[in-house]
Amino acid sequence: MTVKELYEKLCERIPEDLREEWDNDGLMCSSDDGREVKRALITLDVTEDIVDYAISHDIDLIVSHHPLIFKPLKSVTDDSHVARKVIKLIKNDISVMSFHTRADKVEGGVNDILADILGIKNAVPFGEGFLGRIGTLEEELTMEDFSYLLKGLLDCDGVKVSDALIPVQKVAVVGGDGKSYVGAALKAGADTFVSGRIGYNVMAEAGEMGINLIEAGHFFTEQPVTQFFQGLLHRLDPDMYVEIMDSNVIRLI
């Protein structure tokens, strides 16, 4: 299957009309979209280490969640870290496609996976663009018990918690940066909101708002989507070599 054919097939499953207006995703770069894809690498972020690994391991295609190019490039020179990666990729005939907010929204994508991992039942979309998911746990938990459970399930280095001193049962999730969805989660009836990033100012008001808040890390709340991409590629071409690579560059010391 060629790069172009593969992208078109993936767009049938992750439609372009799900993309947020401010977002930039799609086929990010390709020297030849008619090139056959035999070896693919899946990652959350296209870091320079990921690019170098792809070059040294004869990868034809990188599929990422976060866009390789987010802000417009005014020039393509090796003075820019983004342009430098694009140059390397083009020189080595490696294509990149990214899916970002449409993979957040799509059925079976980032937020459905996150809800499933956390044991949230009957999860339904909520919030602007219906990006988030909200549902209920099978049993009520204390905030402390749920926080430790979540930390283990997501394999987090640690989580930030702001406790409204209420039990946890109706839980809303938004992978990545979800601070703008706290109000929508509260309006939808959530007693607890989980996201990758919420921020100090919002978390400081959790008690006053009457909602438990857990900040579990951008990477840890979105990394599971790599398995979603892997499954899609394997179904489209069972003979394709597909590898997932961890791109987390942030450490908790």
Residue ranges of model-derived segments:
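Active-site catalytic microenvironments in core metabolic enzymes, especially phosphate/sugar-handling
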Residues: 1-253
